[in-house]
Swiss-Prot record:
Acetyltransferase involved in the biosynthesis of limonoids triterpene natural products such as limonin, a compound with insecticidal activity responsible for the bitter taste in citrus. Catalyzes the formation of (1S)-1-acetoxy-luvungin A from (1S)-1-hydroxy-luvungin A. Belongs to the plant acyltransferase family. GO terms for molecular function: acyltransferase activity; oxidoreductase activity. Pathway: Secondary metabolite biosynthesis; terpenoid biosynthesis. The active site is at residues 155, 381. Its EC number is 2.1.1.-. It catalyses: (1S)-1-hydroxy-luvungin A + acetyl-CoA = (1S)-1-acetoxy-luvungin A + CoA. Keywords: Acyltransferase, Transferase. Monomer. This is Limonoid 1-O-acetyltransferse.
Amino acid sequence: MEINNVSSEIIKPSSPTPQHLKTHKLSVLDQVAGDSLFPIILFYPQTCSNNTSLNKTSDLLKRSLSQTLTLYHPFAGRLKDEFSIDCDDTGATFIEARAAASDMSEIVKQPTVDMLEQLMPYKLNEKPSVAVNLAAKVTYFEHCGGMALCVCFSHVIADITTAANFIKTWVTFASGSDTSSEDDDVIKHAVFGCSSIFPPQKFSSFSRNVISENHSNSAEILTKRFIFDGDKIAALKEKMGSESSSGYHPTRVEAVSAIILGGIMSVEKQADDFNHSHLVASIAVNLRNRVNPPIPEQSIGNIVQAGIAKLPIEKKTIDYRNLAETLHKSIEKINDEYLRKFHADGGFLSNMNDVLEGLFDKNCRWFTISAWCRRPLYEADFGWGKPAWVSTVMKHKDVAVLLDSSDGKGIEAWVALPKKDMAKFEQDSGILRYASIDTSLI
């Protein structure tokens, strides 16, 4: 597949950022998120038929992006230091590309990291020559009329909720909807600062190195997509619920996460040395509605904290229901009382260091789950219809990103593992029973 970039420009906010908003203070949760860019890729079939319509589409995207940056001004700024963003209206990157001889279905039917990476403004392990907090790339597939829009967000100031709300606002401006009525909350709370709730802290070089290592990429990582059908998930949820003596009924994310974690355990049990006694599962939890008073849902930043479940790796048959319920308990304990204690008197760092020690415990394997489900990404209609497929791409070791399938019932899991483990993971009985690989979506 050959994709050629035809233009690149910097999009500035349509209105200058007021002086009193020139500095956006980071929270400690922003500080620990790392400075990598994470992508969301939206695929639209049959959007453009000629150069005139391509130009109109690009102009619309750029104009509405400029308007959106006025509300989300930190995304047009630059990281000033470890405590703040300079909202200097430098702008965001916008790249236009053409795939003259390729059909978009080639990617959607059997996506690979290499294919998806070509749709990004920058490669996954590439540092932009000029640091940006947001970069977008639109790729037109001239052979079929399809289009892919990739938006990359800096993890310093965005979690998946922030990213989804940014795209929703961008769509609102592009479609010409009235942003002064139903979207008042977006305008009012888009840059609600959380530094007063989760104050920033000075990090030691050790903590900073640990965070960087946890976000590093590796050529020895293999990333694949596993599709969990909605009907199979529903049956799995019902089975788990019937087996629970406590009345527990799993969510879609908890049920699918249990199958994935069971697959990782299976890999560990097949290892020649079998030296990991536990699997430490980490799942990002949205804090917006878990504190009192709640933080506005539209607020930007990394308003998430990890739920941690330490799961014993045993020779006996894997109990998926128990895995799901243990993960559920680790999520549910993150409430207002827990968060106030965790962050009280600047205690976040000491508590975080206790967690980080688990990363380097030779008896534990760490696996991270990021659930992007129940976000309105499939509602992103800029004026040419809703996306046929929404995806991401990553290479972080021992990570799974979960997204809704297009029907809203299933889940697509992007799983990144060391190459030596992926073949074993694919053959795990739970994965074979509940997931499929390389299934055509459109």
